[in-house]
From Swiss-Prot:
Domain (Topo IIA-type catalytic) ranges: 713-1125
Signal peptide: none
Molecular-function annotations in GO: ATP binding; DNA binding; DNA topoisomerase type II (double strand cut, ATP-hydrolyzing) activity; metal ion binding
Amino-acid positions noted as binding Mg(2+) 2 in the UniProt annotation, renumbered to this chain: D538, D540
SMART domains cross-referenced by the UniProt entry: TOP2c, TOP4c
Organism of origin: Invertebrate iridescent virus 6
Family per record: Belongs to the type II topoisomerase family.
Protein name: DNA topoisomerase 2
UniProt: Mg(2+) 1 binding residues: E448, D538
Active site, per annotation: Y803 (o-(5'-phospho-dna)-tyrosine intermediate)
Length: 1132
């Protein structure tokens, strides 16, 4: 009889094994995952959010023991033995100790039901029951008041189960006993309780455990930071009860709730409220709009990550009362009303509550589900909040948005219009058969501007075929709509804004679209004026963006159009794009002529690398549709078509690319960009290419976003944005000795580098690069001549670009060494991918910008300190040591103070001096303003202070470069109440790194270390290049000298000789051939070169070349760098 090998289908687990096998059901997953958590630094000086990699269970087993200690504060309250201290200690091996005094667990077997073993009731000590057996608790009696976090009798036992060892020590002074018991092997084994006598007068409970790291993962610095946050929570909660909290023997300095909330570094106004019976306390803070700033809340000492009823108990009455005040009738805003969504993102709540018998969402207790709580918001609090400057600004901006969105019926009005194929749209040429029974066979061509329209008109007579047989031609079948202006990102726009965008409405009217219509049926498709759309964009990143915006419009509002339901449309897809080449190479061999078209830069570069480049090759760049001649249009019109197809991930990718709320996902998307990881090849020989929307987003549209960031974010190596780099390149190309008008230089740069974003942007860039007032540049890269703006208004008072001049300052070539130019990588537009400055300009001049998905704010630092640090780094590097850069921000000409204020933040202070009092009035002088506060702005602030009676008078004696305000007041004035301070952050230092990827640097040291490592490599590259260049020059010079001697000594006969004979002589005598394999450098020498003085010059040149080669041979890259630094220093 055969035996069965089938496993048992059903089984049971012990309580312990159930926790070990399925921990996520009770305590949380043991699998480490990336998530956002609050962490605290070693000094307990700041609480911040951070992405960490951690298993939830590892955190929870710590919190469960800690929560028991907090619960004991409440149990001990009002007793003869109140809790006075809680101590937490974490050893290097992960062993964790949590100790608390106060009321103790009695060392007795008389106060519990015991446990059942083999069907028999056995008495056990309270400690063994509480810490060693699941579902044991003192919290099951719901008839008594319970203001603790414990409820289910599971928490600390899970810590025991998920630990390799777990020990509990209890001292009971009343019974004069000490209890010790240790469990091992995940609570499966125990050495048994040991009870001894104790003379200690202070009772305590102490838990010592070592987590099962094999299951949970090891402690990291981030995890310890999370533990500190939970310990800090305990210190805050315990402070009101006079309980001291220690972490690793260090007492935490939290004395009240406000001390705790300050650690979140709130920069705006805040206010605190305490419920009359003391059961709850809240701090309400105004914050910059950020929907991810969740409330910070606690129930009975337990951190509730997701809030709950205690948070709602404050937020609901607060926002109800706030809106009732903000929405009072107004002549300006009439019947408009703000709603919750207009104000809630701007307030953050910090809540601490004590609740009887709390009910949570799960064992992890992230949210309070009941009881329902209602707290009281006094009217005076709402009055104060409404007077906050931030709230006033919010009120005004929110009502302005409502005013703009008042007319929400425009779409309905538009849809109610009858279908009119010959709609009046400026510059639109409708197809003759559009809107007829043959409209489904018509195609609307969408292009950019009138020059692109001309291209389309020239091309439609050629026609387009997607099958190779049925070619449609002419105006009967093709309509042409040139887009006039910027196409709206409709995914973030309300209906009013969308319909007011004429570019969108032109497309809607031309197509005959009806909002809300389902176009998945043949009948609904026939209602359109056109059956398909072809986009003809410019062949650049901006053209890709237009494609994306049009696709986004149809996907968001008319996604059913992507599904072909009309049989004829299978051969003519609904939406496609016509591509034109960006580069044409015209080969000019002796016989014949070949033209090769390239649709991507990558394909062109590959061709150049794989083919020998001939001087007769001609290159033509197509910068836009307007660069194509009329006679050339038929050759390329419709020859490369890309068909857009919907795919399963299209919605997710469209949201990622265009939706405001997906900002974090967009950042990660851009960070991971790899231009070499491509699956779509536009240079494929196929005429018709199929492209999924997801692939378009991730491989094509991302190029626009990256280019947008290049315009907005600086590069780590040269510290320049794209436009700044183009200006430096253009100025070097200009190479004029005289000053040049800003307007002239801008036009020259635009022409030289094919800058596509308007000369006005270049004018602004040039002006900013030359400005010298406080806060503009520590080292201006251009020399100003004229009025370039002052600190009066932050440079906005600059004169017109037509009237002011710039020049190349002497320092420019000391920072950007011309010797590096040959070894830099260059773009197709001509300028370097990045320059290689001798010093890190990114740290010296800083940078501010906003791009797609990213912004940056990099402070300025002292060039002298940076240079000293570079010298130290170079010297210590050669000794095998590492230098750490630690400097605080510095702004040239600033006379105030800059002080560190927590991690990643500094405060700049203006200067306020107290003069002698006069007639009961305080007299003050303001002689400096904080960074980025301009003189005119402070004058406006003083006018407001006078209206609010903070000050009495304000006399302005400031000049263009200095600040001087004389202020009198009946009150004592401070830096704080005059707002003479501003924050300088180092928490958003985003830039392109050495690999061309977007990277956020956390510290100045991180930037400097990477800059130094990359810069030293460039010096070595320069050294090798110079040696190669010098050796080649030496070889040529020595060959010239030998050639002169051989000719003069008649060893070589060249007079009346055939070329072949001369060449053979040179070959036989082993003369050096040039790069072309020729001897032209010898044979083209002028006969005057054979005169003695020229021979002497050549000999002197050879000696100089040998000296230079010797110098570069004996000098390492660090010494080269130091030499450049020493030459630069006198110009700083």
């Amino acid at each position: 009889m055969a035996t069965s090998n089938h496993k048992k289908q059903y089984t049971t687990l012990s309580d312990i094994d159930h926790v070990l096998l399925r921990p996520e059901v009770i305590i949380g997953s043991t699998v480490p995952m990336e998530q956002t958590e609050y962490v605290v630094d070693e000094n307990f000086s700041e609480i911040l959010e951070k992405q960490v990699f951690v298993s939830e269970a590892l955190i929870r087993i710590f919190v469960e023991v800690l929560a028991n200690a907090v619960d004991n504060i409440h149990r001990s309250k009002g007793s003869s033995t109140p809790c006075k201290s809680i101590k937490i200690k974490i050893e290097d091996d992960g062993t964790t100790m949590i100790h608390n005094d106060g009321q103790v667990i009695k060392i007795s077997k008389e106060e519990n039901d015991g446990i059942e073993i083999n069907g028999k009731k056995c008495s056990v000590y309270n400690h063994e029951l509480v810490f060693g057996h699941l579902r044991s608790s003192s919290n099951y009696d719901d008839t008594v008041v319970r203001q603790t976090s414990g409820k289910n009798g599971l928490g600390v036992k899970c810590t025991n189960i998920l630990s390799k060892s777990f020990k509990v020590i209890g001292v009971d002074p009343e019974n004069k006993k000490k209890f010790v018991q240790e469990w091992t092997n995940n609570m499966k084994e125990t050495s048994g309780p040991k009870v001894t006598t104790s003379s200690s007068k202070t009772g305590y409970t102490e838990v010592i455990y070592c987590p099962d790291f094999e299951r949970l993962g090891n402690f990291s610095s981030d995890i310890i930071g999370i533990f500190r946050k939970h310990v800090l929570d305990v210190a805050m909660l315990a402070s009101s009860e006079g309980v001291s909290v220690y972490f690793n023997d260090k007492k935490l300095p939290i004395k009240k709730f406000s001390d705790y909330t300050k650690l979140f570094k709130l920069e705006k106004e805040s206010i605190s409220i305490t419920e009359e019976d003391g059961s709850s306390e809240v701090t309400i803070a105004f914050v910059e709009r950020d929907g991810k700033k969740k409330p910070i809340s606690f129930v009975n000492g337990l951190f509730t990550k997701h809030g709950g009823q205690h948070v709602d108990g404050w937020t609901k009455p607060f926002f109800a009362n706030l809106l009732s005040v903000l929405n009072k009738p107004s002549k300006t805003y009439k019947d408009l009303k703000l709603s919750l969504k207009d104000v809630t993102p701007y307030f953050r709540f910090f809540v601490k509550s004590t609740v009887d018998k709390p009910q949570f969402d799960c064992q992890n207790k992230n949210m309070l589900k009941s009881p329902c709580l209602k707290y009281t918001i006094p009217d005076k609090i709402i009055t104060k909040v409404c007077k906050w400057t931030s709230v006033q600004e919010l009120k005004q901006s929110s009502f302005e948005k409502l005013l703009k969105g008042k007319d929400n019926n425009i779409i309905k009005t538009l849809n109610d219009k009858k279908r009119r194929p010959k709609v009046s749209v400026k510059e639109y040429d409708p197809a003759n058969k559009a809107g007829t029974t043959l409209s489904e066979k018509c195609t609307l061509i969408v292009c950019e501007g009138l020059s692109a329209k001309t291209y389309a008109v020239a091309g439609i007579s050629t026609g387009i075929s997607f099958t190779g047989t049925d070619t449609k031609k002419g105006r009967d079948w093709f309509g042409i709509l040139p887009l006039r202006g910027k196409f709206l990102n409709v995914r973030n726009a309300n209906n009013d804004k969308m319909i007011k965008n004429t570019v969108v409405t032109d497309l809607v009217n031309a197509m005959g679209l009806t909002f809300g219509m389902d176009y998945s049926t043949q009948k609904s498709r026939k209602s359109l004026n056109y059956g398909s759309i072809i986009i003809i964009p410019d062949p650049d990143e901006d053209g890709i963006h237009i494609e994306g915006l049009v696709l986004n419009f149809f996907h968001h509002h008319f996604s059913s159009l992507f599904n072909p339901v009309v049989p004829n449309l299978k051969d003519f897809p609904f939406i496609s794009s016509m591509k034109i080449p960006i580069i044409k190479v015209i080969e000019k061999p002796l016989k014949g002529r070949r033209e090769i078209e390239f649709f991507t830069h990558e394909a062109f570069h590959k061709f150049k690398n794989e083919n020998k480049w001939h001087k007769n090759h001609e290159i033509k760049y197509f910068k836009g549709l307007g660069t194509t001649k009329h006679e050339d249009v038929p050759k390329i019109f419709g020859k490369k078509m890309v068909v857009f197809n919907i795919d399963d991930n299209a919605h997710e990718n469209m949201e990622k690319a265009f939706k405001d709320e997906e900002a974090d996902e967009r950042k990660e998307w851009l960070k991971q960009y790899n231009p070499n990881a491509r699956t779509f090849d536009l240079d494929s020989p196929n005429k018709i290419l199929q492209l999924n929307i997801s692939t378009f987003i991730n491989e094509e549209l991302i190029k626009f976003s990256i280019e947008d960031c290049k315009r907005s974010l600086p590069h780590l190596i040269d510290g320049l944005k794209e436009s700044q780099r183009k200006v430096i390149f253009g100025l070097k190309q200009w190479n004029g000795k005289n000053n040049i008008k800003v307007a002239q230089l801008g036009a020259f740069v635009a022409q030289k580098t094919d800058y596509k974003h308007g000369e006005q942007n270049l004018f602004d860039t040039i002006i900013k690069m030359a400005q010298t007032f406080v806060g503009a540049n520590n080292i201006p890269l251009l020399e100003e001549d004229g009025q370039f703006g002052t600190r009066l208004s932050g440079g906005k008072d600059a004169a017109s670009p037509r009237y002011i001049f710039v020049n190349q300052p002497p320092i420019l070539n000391k920072i950007f060494r011309p010797e590096d130019d040959p070894i830099l990588n260059y773009t197709l537009d001509g300028e370097p991918v990045f320059y290689a400055p001798v010093i890190p300009l990114i740290c010296i001049n800083g940078s501010v910008g906003v791009g797609t998905g990213f912004s940056c704010n990099i402070p300025m630092f002292n060039p002298s300190e940076i240079i000293d640090g570079l010298k130290q780094w170079i010297n210590m590097r050669e000794q095998g040591e590492k230098y750490v850069f630690k400097y605080k921000p510095w702004y040239k000409g600033f006379t105030g103070k800059i002080e560190k204020n927590g991690s990643g933040r500094y405060i700049s202070y203006g200067t306020l001096s107290n003069e002698a009092s006069n007639n009961g009035m305080y007299q003050y002088t303001v002689s400096e303003l904080p960074i980025n506060m301009w003189t005119d702005k402070f004058k406006e602030m003083c006018d407001q202070y006078r209206e609010s009676n903070l000050i009495k008078t304000c006399d302005n004696y400031s000049e263009v470069t200095t600040v001087n305000f004389k202020i009198s007041s009946e009150h004592e004035l401070t830096i704080e109440n005059l707002k003479l301070r501003s924050y300088i952050h180092t928490s958003n230092m985003v830039m392109f790194d050495h690999e061309g990827k977007i990277h956020k640097y956390e510290t100045l040291n991180g930037i400097m270390q990477r800059f130094c490592k990359e810069r030293i490599k460039i010096y070595e590259k320069r050294r090798q290049y110079m040696l190669q260049k010098l050796n080649k020059s030496l070889t040529i010079s020595e060959n010239k000298k030998r050639f002169m001697e051989d000719v003069m000594n008649q060893k070589i006969k060249i007079l009346l000789q055939e070329d072949e004979v001369v060449h053979q002589q040179l070959l036989d005598m082993n003369y050096y051939k040039d790069d072309e394999g020729e001897f032209d450098y010898l044979l083209n020498m002028n006969i005057g070169g054979f005169r003695k003085k020229n021979v002497d010059k050549l000999i002197s040149k050879i000696d100089d070349l040998k000296k230079d080669i010797m110098w570069y041979t004996n000098t390492n890259e660090g010494q080269m760098w130091l030499k450049d630094i020493l030459e630069l220093e006198p110009f700083i």
